[in-house]
Swiss-Prot record:
Localization terms from the record: Cytoplasm
Gene Ontology MF: a single term: RNA binding
Name of this chain's protein: Eukaryotic translation initiation factor 3 subunit K
UniProt keyword list: Cytoplasm, Initiation factor, Protein biosynthesis
Gene source species: Pyricularia oryzae (strain 70-15 / ATCC MYA-4617 / FGSC 8958) (Rice blast fungus)
Any Gene Ontology CC annotation: eukaryotic translation initiation factor 3 complex
């Protein structure tokens, strides 16, 4: 089962991006193009650098003439794949309220992405896949993000593995938005789970392992004597 990646300081981040994030270059309008190209790299190579993307959104705040709607939606989609986390909300709060309040393509796109993110955050996975299929605009919004659906499915699988040892195959079908052969291939090959009949067997891990809870309460002699004394007083 793959581990959840480090999205704040990913190992893929090059030194020149670190210099922009941590230095005075983060206020330089000329850094916009560099950060936009870095976002393209993230989309193509399936990793996310939320720190760098927030830096880009802050530069957009300072330089509204440089704003690109497609870049904003790509940042939001990348943040969405990190559910459950505050990354989507943090990116959303860096957007210009005036841009979102207008009846524009960006406003509509952000509204749709917010709805998708809410479904993922609320573990409404079946509803998420149904929503994705309901409007071609969702495909347009996620087309730049290589492996978007696979990343979401892997994230769901990780969360399921943290909570369960056994899951009905029919439930996994709904949660992963797959059926029959593709579903079984993903479960066994991408996730490393086993299928026995209509049950998905999930390997034991520190999160889903049943642990015996031990509750101890220390009672000293003085506390015990007070209880006995109070009982005698009530009788008397």
């Amino acid at each position: 089962m793959p581990r959840l990646p480090n999205s704040e300081d990913p190992p893929e981040r090059p030194d020149f991006i670190t210099n922009i994030i941590n230095g005075l270059e983060r206020y330089n309008p000329e850094a916009v193009g560099t950060l936009e190209q870095y976002l393209t790299t993230q989309c193509e190579e399936r990793f996310c650098d939320c720190n760098a993307n927030r830096t880009l959104l802050k530069l957009y705040q300072l330089n509204p003439d440089r704003i690109k709607d497609e870049v904003i939606t790509n940042i939001l989609v990348k943040a969405m794949t990190l559910f459950p986390s505050p990354q989507f909300s943090q990116a959303l709060h860096l957007l210009s309220p005036s841009a979102l309040s207008q009846q524009s393509e960006l406003s509509e796109a952000v509204s749709k992405l917010r709805a998708l993110n809410n479904q993922l955050e609320g573990a409404q996975y079946a509803r998420f896949w149904a929503t994705i299929e309901s409007d071609d605009l969702y495909a347009d919004l996620t087309t730049d993000i290589q492996g978007f659906e696979e990343m979401v499915r892997l994230r769901i699988a990780v969360l399921v593995s943290q909570a369960f040892r056994e899951v009905q195959l029919s439930l996994m079908e709904q949660w992963l938005g797959l059926d029959e052969a593709p579903l079984k291939t993903f479960i066994t090959e991408a996730c490393g789970f086993k299928i026995e009949g209509d049950i998905v067997q999930i390997p034991k891990n520190p999160d889903n392992e049943a642990k015996k809870a031990e509750i101890r309460e220390d009672v000293n002699v003085e506390m015990f004597s007070r209880v006995i004394r109070r009982a005698w007083e009530e009788v008397a």
